[in-house]
Amino acid sequence: LRVSRRDNSLKEESEHVKAKSFLAVSRRDEAFVILKQLAEDMSTPYGAESAYMLILDSYDKGDFEDVEKKVYAFSDSGSRQTYWLAKSFIILGDSFAERSELSQAKATFESVRDGYTPSGEDDDVLDNVRVRLAKLEEMITEQNNR
């Protein structure tokens, strides 16, 4: 059983590297086939990162409803991959801001800020949230002054 788990982990890592390599050389269609397969198991680091990358792709395409759907599915999956889940919620907050739903964006960012525990000193989640909250406050102030 230990060998099969290790084999699965190595295969998953290999597929993840392949997907990122495809992205690096603009072979997006091939990359996203692999990422979708990996994201079926969001409990693993590679599956969680793949889910995040699919969410980011939806955001980049301006498909904010799909962003919401995917982030909530990730959250409902029960994954313990909190870094990628938090990064996904940041994208969700960005999608609310893009739609001028500033109070919803603020609530989303504050939820991440208040509920997330960094996993190490290289963890950039809370820094990203702080920057977004500051920018959001500027946007809200500007909107209120109109």
Region locations from a protein language model:
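Acidic, polar-rich low-complexity tracts and alpha-helical solenoid repeat scaffolds
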Residues: L1-R146
